[in-house]
C-alpha cells in the first residue's frame, strides 16, 4: 500500500469517527430530553414510577430516601418463614443489593409459610429459588446467593461487604454466631424468631454501640428447651407478620429514622392467638461486662475463626449419639422382623407428641413422649400403668418422627427402667413411610 492510499484510508476513518462521535452526542442529548429537563436523574423513569407511591410517604425521605435504598446492601441469613416475606418486601421496596445465605432445599412442607417458593421449586436450593422469584418481582435488585451453612469458618468472609444483616434463622446457636460476628465487624442486626402462632424481634448492635444478643441472653437456653418448627409447628401468616416487621425495621434503619440519639433497645413480641397482640419492651443498653461487645471482650474475630468458641456446646445441643449399632433397626428390619409378623411378641412405642401421633400413626402402637418417660421414677410398675403388657424381657421397638427422640427414649428405657430388649428405628416414622408404606401421610 502506497503512502497516498494510507493517507486516504486514514482520512476516511477520521470522517467515520467524527460521525460516530456526533451520533453518540445526539443519543446522549435525546436521553437527557427523555429523562426530563432536570438533568441527570438518580434513577430510571421506570424506577420513579415503580417506587412513586412509596416515595411520597413522608417517613421515607422522598427521593433521597429511595436513593439510599437503591445503594443499600442487605444480607438475609435464612430464606425460610421469616426470610421469605422479609426478602419480598425489601426487594419490592427497592433495596439495590440483597444477599441470601441458605443451604437448605425447598420442601413441600415449607410452602405454607415460605411464599417465595412454589411447588415447581421443590428440591431446589432455597437461595436459588428465592433469587429467581425476587428477580421477577424487581429486576432492578441485584441478588447474590451463598448456598452454604453459615459457620464460624465462613461468616467473616460473607458479612464484610454488607451494610445490614437480617437474622432469619431458627436456632440460638446461629443467633449467637451472627451477633458475635456482626459486633466484630461493626454491623447492625435485625433479628427475629417465631414458632407456632407467636414470635419476637429485636435490633442488635445498632451503629456498633450495642447491645448485642449476648447482652440480652448471656445464658443460653436449657438443652432440649428450644422447639423447632419441625417439632413445634408454625402457622404461616403469624411467622409472615414477623418477617414483614423485620423488613419494616430494616427500612427504618436504612432511611435513617433511627439515630444514636433516639434509638432505644427493645424487644417486640407478637402473638396471633386468640387475639392478635403486639407488645414492646424496653431493654437495657450494652453491658459493660459483655463477653462480646463489652469493655474487655474475649469473643473476638480470632477466637471465633479459630473455632475456640464452641457454639454448639454453649447452646446445649442434645447429643443423640447414645446407642450402639446393635441397638438400632432399619425401617426394613423393623418391618421384616417385627411389624409384618402375625404373632407380635413385642411392643411398639411411639414417642412423638400426642398431636403428632393423632395426625398419623401405626395401628396398635402405644404413645408416650420422651419427657414423660424422663419424668418417671423408673419402676416397671409405673410404666405398666401406661403400657400394661410390658415386662422386663419383652421386645420393645421405639419409634419417633425422624429417629432422634427414639434414641433418647431407648436409652432411658434401658438405663432407668432396666429393660433389656429395646431398640429404635433409624429415621423414625418417616423412614418407615419412605421405605415401606408410602401410602401413610407425612406431615
UniProtKB/Swiss-Prot annotation:
GO terms for biological process: cell budding; cellular response to oxidative stress; invasive growth in response to glucose limitation; protein urmylation; regulation of pseudohyphal growth; tRNA wobble position uridine thiolation. Zn(2+) binds at residues 212, 215, 290, 293. Binds 1 zinc ion per subunit. Pathway: tRNA modification; 5-methoxycarbonylmethyl-2-thiouridine-tRNA biosynthesis. ATP binds at residues 81, 102, 109-113, 126, 170-171. It is found in: Cytoplasm, Cytosol. Residues 342-441 form the Rhodanese domain. Its EC number is 2.7.7.-, 2.8.1.-. Keywords: ATP-binding, Cytoplasm, Metal-binding, Multifunctional enzyme, Nucleotide-binding, Nucleotidyltransferase, Transferase, tRNA processing, Ubl conjugation pathway, Zinc. GO terms for cellular component: cytoplasm; cytosol. Transmembrane segments: none annotated. It comes from the Eukaryota. The active site is at residues 229, 400. Its main location: cytoplasm. Its cofactor is Zn(2+). In the N-terminal section; belongs to the HesA/MoeB/ThiF family. UBA4 subfamily. Plays a central role in 2-thiolation of mcm(5)S(2)U at tRNA wobble positions of cytosolic tRNA(Lys), tRNA(Glu) and tRNA(Gln). Acts by mediating the C-terminal thiocarboxylation of sulfur carrier URM1. Its N-terminus first activates URM1 as acyl-adenylate (-COAMP), then the persulfide sulfur on the catalytic cysteine is transferred to URM1 to form thiocarboxylation (-COSH) of its C-terminus. The reaction probably involves hydrogen sulfide that is generated from the persulfide intermediate and that acts as a nucleophile towards URM1. Subsequently, a transient disulfide bond is formed. This is Adenylyltransferase and sulfurtransferase UBA4. The gene is UBA4.
